[in-house]
Amino acid sequence: MILYNSLGQTKQEFIPHTAGKVNMYTCGPTVYHFAHIGNLRTYIMEDVLEKYLRFAGYDVKRVMNITDVGHLSSDADTGEDKMLKGAKREHKTVMEIAKFYTDAFFEDCKKLNIKRPDVVEPATNCIDEFIHMISVLLEKGYAYIAGGNVYFDTSKLDNYYVFGNMNEDDLAVGVRDSVEEDNNKRNKADFVLWFTKSKFDSQELKWESPWGVGYPGWHIECSAISCKHNGEYLDIHCGGIDNAFPHHTNEIAQSEAYLGHKWCKYWFHVLHLNDARGKMSKSKGDFLTVSLLESKGYNPLVYRLFCLQSHYRKPLTFSYDSLDNAAIAYDKLIKKISTLSPDGEPDMEAAKPYLNEFNDALGNDLNTSLGLTAVYSVLKGNISDATKLYLIGEFDKVLSLDLTKAQENKSENPINEEVESLIAQRTEARKNKDWATADAIRDKLKEMKVVVEDTKDGIKWHFEN
């Protein structure tokens, strides 16, 4: 497989640390509000990556954190505490907010056919791991205590800005004018590992530590949770492009300082979803959720298809017109597949060129658009219906669009025997030029919401959606 690596900004052959096994880590949600569909685009594409790696024969372990403490509204240790902000907004405790929005996130994932990671770890479960990692960084001289907080010292590194095109001026992005700069830092790029002097008097979640009662910084969470579950070597780290700096930059800094060797080989970043106002963001107030799309009559899998129609390394612009186009394409695709007959066995030799086409697409930096083209190639191909259904079922292990579900439901529906009998009677009536009987049967089928199509390959039928 060829995969674009943000660390180096080139396409590279994917070679995991241990042959046949892939350790994967995903930056999970900060659970202070609903995920918007821009957030979910990232998780959809990460889901496709995981499923394609499994499809390609790898044994994949995917770990994801849940940030339920420590994430401030600027990724650079400034601004409001997001969890505290959510709790105040809804007059609930931080843990009540965290549970509600964690459940809501996974409900959205379920609707979008996003597989739950093998390990899901809330940050609040790992305080001991955070304290241990910070202690080691202090012992090694990579961290210092100032003003009651523990900071990572970026001046100890030969190269802090590992993703390129970044500098300390970028740390100001997202910081509100009313937020004072942290004068305890020795260098502007330094970041907090542990807060004991919280700027928030009402901070709910605090723990004992060697440096006083406090709570972890956001960046230490992902490093410690990944090391806890994936060990010292990580193959792929995933996230949105806005996580690359400073969050992922800080993860690399502290993880490699702690471990004493290179940590993660490949960095997979998904670009933004934009709307008419620019990048979709919760900070703008109103934002689109899966539930909102459902309330407008859209199947969540239409949004998944919309995402798969574009490459993950390209910004994607959302509009209802483009979603409508995806809905039309999805409806036509499902109807076409539902007309295929499952009778017979697939021809595995005939299937090979189509499998190769799909692998060539997904294996080249996860080109989901060409992967969808492979589905249409199958439908147009001069192969049996059984072979087509086999191939589409295989592809859908990665695409996860429920492409064969309507056909499977049709096969399991007892009413199908009646439909098949009526169609046979209609065919016989037409052969005998008994148009009255043929029309009567057609009307009955219409009442049953059955659509009949006369094609060159014979009669095809499906239920109306």
What are these regions (language model features)?
Residues 279-282, 286-465:
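Structural preference for alpha-helix termini/caps and helix-kink/transition segments
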Residues 54, 138, 446:
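Anion (oxyanion) recognition and catalysis
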Residues 57-60, 111-118, 143-144, 233, ...:
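Surface-exposed helix-capping loop/turn segments at secondary-structure junctions
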Residues 1-32, 47, 107, 127-339:
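Alpha-helical recognition segments enriched in aromatics with Gly/Pro capping
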Residues 92-96, 106-132, 142, 244, ...:
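Non-catalytic interaction-recognition regions
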Residues 8, 17-113, 454-461:
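N-terminal, positively charged nucleic-acid-binding surface of large information/translation enzymes
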Residues 59-61, 141-147, 382, 451-453:
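Short, well-structured beta-strand/strand-turn elements
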Residues 63-69, 98-105, 115-130, 148-157:
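Short, glycine/charge-rich beta-strand/loop segments that flank catalytic centers
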